Structure formats: structure tokens, C-alpha cells
Amino acid sequence: MRVLAIILISLLALWGCRSGPPESQPQPPDGSLFVELGGLAGISRVVDGLLFRIADDQRIVHHFAEADFERLRIQLIEQLCTESGGPCQYQGDSMAEAHAGMSITESEFQAMLEDLAAAMDEEGIAPATQRRLLTRLRPLGRDIIAH
């Protein structure tokens, strides 16, 4: 687990906040969830914090033992950007495909949402904004949680 955290720290240090929306894409209006999350830079910081929390979370870290963290980071940023109404388009697998065979429980899905909320707290995201995002993400559990 310590090795996972060290690898994660190293990768995040290399990535920084290098990604940004293409200038030609329209920006969401002020007051949108995307803007309230701090735009792409804010979402990137939240995802970085989330990945650090996952590395320390004994409830779920085992699901990420073989993860490609660069790909995971990019896909989480795209997904949160898309779900918040930002100018991104999620390019990853469907939630059902991405989580097939992982046997994720409802409590593990909830643990991930808790880690996300803690990462948003750390970034100073307002509680009302956090609730709006989490409300949009909870339905994804239907395709993530093993049935």
C-alpha cells in the first residue's frame, strides 16, 4: 500500500494541472456546477485529492491495485467535468464495462463517494455544491455495484 501511495504521489507530481479545455469550446455559464467546482483546474485538484484518499482507504484500495493511475485520473476528470456540465466529454468505458467483475459492494461505492466528498472539503468546495455533484453521481452506482 505504501508503494501504491508513493507511485501515486510521483505520478501526480508529474501531471500537475497540465490539462485544460480547448479554447475553442464554449465555457459553461457562471453559476453552473462546473464553475462552482472551480472549472477544470478545480476538478483536477479534487481528483488528485481523491486519488490520494483512495490510496489510504483500506475499504477500497484493493480495487485499485492494478489500476493505470494516469488513465484513471484522466477518466475521473473527464467524468466529473461532464457530470458537472463542463466542456468535457467522457471518453471512457461505460460504468458497467469499467467495473465488470470487480464485485464492488454498496458500502465500497459509498466509501468512494465519501472520499470524493472529503477531497472536495479539502478544496473548499461549498457543501451545497458537493451535494449537487454527489446527487448526479449516485445513480452511477446502479452500474458500478455488483448485483
Model-based region annotation:
Residues 5-15:
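Bacterial N-terminal signal peptides
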Residues 17-147:
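Core of compact, soluble alpha-helical bundle domains
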